[in-house]
Amino acid sequence: MSAVKSVSSFRLASLLRRENDPSAAMKLFRNPDPESTNPKRPFRYSLLCYDIIITKLGGSKMFDELDQVLLHLKTDTRIVPTEIIFCNVINFFGRGKLPSRALHMFDEMPQYRCQRTVKSLNSLLSALLKCGELEKMKERLSSIDEFGKPDACTYNILIHGCSQSGCFDDALKLFDEMVKKKVKPTGVTFGTLIHGLCKDSRVKEALKMKHDMLKVYGVRPTVHIYASLIKALCQIGELSFAFKLKDEAYEGKIKVDAAIYSTLISSLIKAGRSNEVSMILEEMSEKGCKPDTVTYNVLINGFCVENDSESANRVLDEMVEKGLKPDVISYNMILGVFFRIKKWEEATYLFEDMPRRGCSPDTLSYRIVFDGLCEGLQFEEAAVILDEMLFKGYKPRRDRLEGFLQKLCESGKLEILSKVISSLHRGIAGDADVWSVMIPTMCKEPVISDSIDLLLNTVKEDGPLSAMPQC
């Protein structure tokens, strides 16, 4: 009988890499050689084995299991881990919004026989930024000289942090400091700054920075930079300039994407130049740029603003023909226009057909339908929709619910009113905000004392009566 061949660290690394289930990978890591003839002999893991399992566990947010592997790595003194492994671990903790664990990992790196440099510090700063821990970022910056000189990545993280926290002038000061210290800015640097300037309506400064990044610093603008500038120009009504920038991007061999075209189409529609949209769509086709869901939603919105439900519906059908899946925004816009032009049957049919089309209605969908049916005095249908939305955990707008109850009271629809009270009882019995709408509204109508008794009994049983207004 031949001897059982033991699993090598090379073989284990291969098995771990091919295992898609992180839990199964962890089980394999814990017991890599179950048929070993000497179970007391510890398995000799390679650095690659540790790297693969750490990546799988961190990417799946299995942080407790990750801690177990890290502890094993710490005590495995044969292995000298590379810094990039800890950079990845710190990034995983940042994505998981675990700043204390990220800090702890960085502080413990020397115990793993790994020297810290500005690279791992950058990972820590990035993780803290993701967690919104700006003060802790400042604390760590005070000791940056221990790990080396700040590089472009360091400045990019800090500039992004200032921009995100609303201190944009500080971001510009960091850029000046960066240049003085002869740290070359990157495309990320300029992208963050130009986006911030555009957001702050400082379009002239943003355009100058776009000019300087190429002429002074030799960094080519990206499609994202052009997107920020074109959007900002459209917002201030500079459509001609926006189109010139789009042409400039093509001249610079930058492929303009659907997001830029969507911005331009939206701006043309808002400016009352809808007749020019077809030319933009033709250009997109010529340039090989396919419209995406956002582009089609912009077109749908344009038709909905003009109350042209037929054209909006045609765009919806075209999306499906082109292999694009309309999203809930697409449907909500068309539902809205159907109700505005009093096409209740078409709206109800589309709403009911959404799940079959692969799109589940959201809170806004239900509110649009409920509000539309109420305005159309379709009380029975509105009560059914209200019951369904409450069952799914959605709530109507306070003012619309108040108006619905008022209309039911005024029209004497007591049977429907009773069903509505029953629905509210099941759906949001403990919601004082909703009951505070119902009681004063219903108390105005003397003919519905039975309904009021039912309502008050419901509140006594399930709601905070002390918070309720009295009749």
Curated annotation (Swiss-Prot):
Any single GO BP term: fruit development
Keyword entries, A-Z: Repeat
Matches recorded under PROSITE patterns: PPR
Domain of life: Eukaryota
Record-linked InterPro entries: Pentatricopeptide_rpt, PPR_P_subfamily, TPR-like_helical_dom_sf
Pfam short name (any one): PPR
Keyword Phosphoprotein: no
The keyword Repeat is annotated on this UniProt entry: yes
First and last residues of every PPR repeat: 46-81, 82-116, 117-147, 151-185, 186-221, 222-256, 257-291, 292-326, 327-361, 362-396
Function description: Involved during embryo development.
NCBIfam families recorded: PPR
Family that this chain belongs to: Belongs to the PPR family. P subfamily.
Name recorded for this polypeptide: Putative pentatricopeptide repeat-containing protein At1g53330
Source organism (scientific name): Arabidopsis thaliana
